[in-house]
Design a protein with these regions (language model features):
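Conserved active-site segments centered on acidic
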Residues: 1-77, 134, 138-144
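Phosphate-binding/catalytic loops
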Residues: 81, 87-144
Length: 144
């Protein structure tokens, strides 16, 4: 269980933040970590400036050339865990996967992570994402 993909609506705020925070926390480089979108609305767009700013503030390395990418059926096959950032993302993932990968689809944290695209609160998003990534990393290690 070492391949994880974080998924949000557009793949420009929450899921790339989770991707880069988790990569930073995974000091042993044990995990293969990526992020995707449930929609194609932001396809190819770079990580949101608010996300980039907060990652810089906390000295989290990130790929500034990363572009938004919609999740595919091949992704459901490849990844061991498909983690939706909120309940709506999980519902979309369950629908997109048509019931074939329900066991891989998980909610990032109880209550989800509010979308800073709408809230404007990238600081709160970062705190929730960091705490959630720590929990996921421990959860994964406990199952190895």
């Amino acid at each position: 269980m070492n391949k994880i993909v974080f998924v949000c609506l557009g793949n420009i705020c929450r899921s790339p933040m989770a991707e880069f925070v988790m990569k930073e926390l995974d000091q042993e480089k044990y995990l293969h970590i990526e992020s995707r979108a449930t929609s194609s609305w932001e396809h190819g767009n770079s990580v949101h400036q608010g996300t980039q700013k907060i990652l810089r503030k906390y000295a989290i390395s990130f790929d500034s050339s990363k572009g938004s990418q919609q999740i595919s059926q091949a992704d459901f096959e490849f990844f061991d865990l498909v983690v939706g950032m909120d309940e709506s993302n999980v519902e979309d993932l369950l629908q997109i996967s048509a019931g074939r990968y329900d066991d891989k689809i998980k909610l990032f944290r109880p209550g989800g992570v509010p979308d800073p695209w709408y809230t404007g609160d990238f600081e709160e998003t970062y705190k929730l994402v960091t705490a959630g990534c720590r929990d996921w990393l421990q959860w994964i290690k406990d199952r190895q």
